[in-house]
Amino acid sequence: MPWIQIKINSTGGQAETLSDALMENGAVSVTFQDSHDNPVFEPLPGETLLWGDTDVIGLFDAETEMSAVIAELENHPALGAGFRHKIEQIEDKDWEREWMDNFHPMQFGHRLWICPSWREIPEPDAVNVMLDPGLAFGTGTHPTTALCLQWLDGLDLAGKTVIDFGCGSGILAIAALKLGAARAIGIDIDPQAIQASRDNAERNGVSGRLELYLPKDQPADLSADVVVANILAGPLRELAPLIGCLPRQGGLLGLSGILASQAESVCEAYREKFALDPVAEREEWCRITGVHR
């Protein structure tokens, strides 16, 4: 069955009230989308994350009289007569099947593969992490995750302890364990991420070597041979005093979630304690690595 979609640009502060207005006028679903594709944190449980410039997208049954919906929305205080919007008809698809068909095993570096469970493993003798996309956490498709996976693949992790700061799906911690690390520690602000990491670790047979913590529960004396943090430039700068103390003397640090234009400001926050390598870039994103002095 086809559907009608309306897209309205809004500020983050008005988006939720527009969502309510769309639902009151017959929308079967409403979603929020960043107008500029800016990276953001995962929201805390119970929070709705909104950008400064947000597209509010309502989906209606194909038989909906949209002129009547528009007339009602023009009375909304955030819109008014003649508000800008885009309406289009979209065809119904088996979205789940299409999505599954488009998700393939991916190789990172020389040894490491990330494989969905419904695909045949391309290299059975390689290091294979089985990971199905689920919650909005890393699966390897984003350039920042790919940069971190490639970095881990190039390290000798045998017997090492690795901290994955902002672990999301646990993909980096699990990859480190499969690459030979003796122990991994995942830290995330979101309980859903902790659960996703736990589930993925069990699927990959490494749950006994993965410790998971919310920040409030993590031990005070945490340290590791390798620390990887794939979050965002702002938090990486703000949390530099904390993250910078996690690698042991001579330990390795890998940072990503950083736009290339933000690299220098992040480097500046870590340069005092770390001998930094040249910045690695991929599709306007970058990775910063270094050794704890």
From Swiss-Prot:
Q: Which domain of life is it from?
A: Bacteria
Q: Which reaction does it catalyse?
A: L-lysyl-[protein] + 3 S-adenosyl-L-methionine = N(6),N(6),N(6)-trimethyl-L-lysyl-[protein] + 3 S-adenosyl-L-homocysteine + 3 H(+)
EC class of this enzyme?
A: transferase
GO biological process terms held by the UniProt record: methylation
| GO cellular component terms given for this protein | cytosol
Q: Where in the cell is it found?
A: Cytoplasm
Does Methyltransferase count among this protein's keywords? yes
The entry's S-adenosyl-L-methionine-binding residues are: T145, G166, D188, N230
One GO term in the molecular function aspect is:
protein-lysine N-methyltransferase activity
Q: Does the keyword S-adenosyl-L-methionine apply?
A: yes
Q: Which UniProt keywords apply?
A: Cytoplasm, Methyltransferase, S-adenosyl-L-methionine, Transferase
Main location per UniProt?
A: cytoplasm
Question: In UniProt terms, what function does this protein have?
Answer: Methylates ribosomal protein L11.
Which NCBIfam families does the record associate with it?
Answer: prmA (TIGR00406)
| Stated family | Belongs to the methyltransferase superfamily. PrmA family.
Q: What is this protein called?
A: Ribosomal protein L11 methyltransferase
- Look up and give the organism this protein is from: Edwardsiella ictaluri (strain 93-146)
The taxonomic lineage of its organism, from the top, reads: Bacteria, Pseudomonadati, Pseudomonadota, Gammaproteobacteria, Enterobacterales
The encoding gene is: prmA
